[in-house]
Amino acid sequence: MIEMKPNGESNFYTFNRFYERFKNSDNRYDTWELIERYMQQLKEWYHSFDLFHHIGFLVATGTSVKSLLDIAMSTDHPIKKSDFKLRVLDMIREKMAFKVGDNDFGEDIDYAELNYEDHSEFIQYVLLLFNIETIRQKGDENVRFPFYRYKNEGTWSLEHIHAQNSESLKTNQEWKEWLEVHKKSLEGLEVSSDDKKQIEEVIDKMNTIITHINEKGYKGSIRDEFNAVAPAVINILSDGDDKSQMHTLSNMALLTVGENAALNNSTFDVKRMKIIAMDKAGEYIPVCTRNVFMKYYSSSDTKLHFWSEEDRKGYISAMNNVLYDYKEKNSNKEIKLIRNRINYGNRK
């Protein structure tokens, strides 16, 4: 860890590096003292609830532990513990000031202009910090952000909260899975009698396609049949959705749905049912992702089965409350971890 362990190296890499240094050292006492100082500093960070989360974010997004140790333990430029904490906050703000092009002279990107196709890494930074700070700001010393899950489990990906794209599905199995999960969602909707008739007609078409997929030797085009019904399904399960916001922060979450293409390309209600199933099974769900699908950030009068414009605005408002408007409970001091407020829609 301290010596920038390369990928694929043994878990004992750090020990082995120090052991080699120990063997070749003329003054083993100094080497051992250095090890103890490193260990003491790391333990101090770990036991500091705030530094655990703030340093954890920096390391999770590419800052080396060694560089942080160099700052905290420098003898040439000694730094007070209080000043080190402020320096860490500055490093987070610097990391959250996104630019395109040259690192020093590139163009600033407004948070509202971040989109999944061009800035997925930046969006992941925002959502990761949002999840970390949501936990840290609650102040429960017994509940910490699980960095070991984020690093080791490899299942956290950037996902659309509500997807409208079924074009990436290519196989009969993917089409069948998509039809089955969305049919279940349609069957659970509470609608008027007129809408119910329309939904039943769409479900009949979905059942026909599923039958054709299961039918050996079927000569028709499953692709054409699927492409004909999918837009109607998506339209029913969308609520006045603004397609211009499809790839923006307001429609993205850290989600652990894995490699299931049919689910990844599903609408909000289908993913919501999956999140509920995962929760019942005791699987870990990032806190802000769980809040999104449980409508924690939404007003009480929003429709449970849809991800609407009001829901997206509530989601962005929650990000601002945590990342821009947060005040320390004891001092009421503002801590802004992003350079300005996140707007919904275009830059204002």
PLM regions: where:
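Flexible coil/loop and intrinsically disordered segments
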Residues: M1-K348
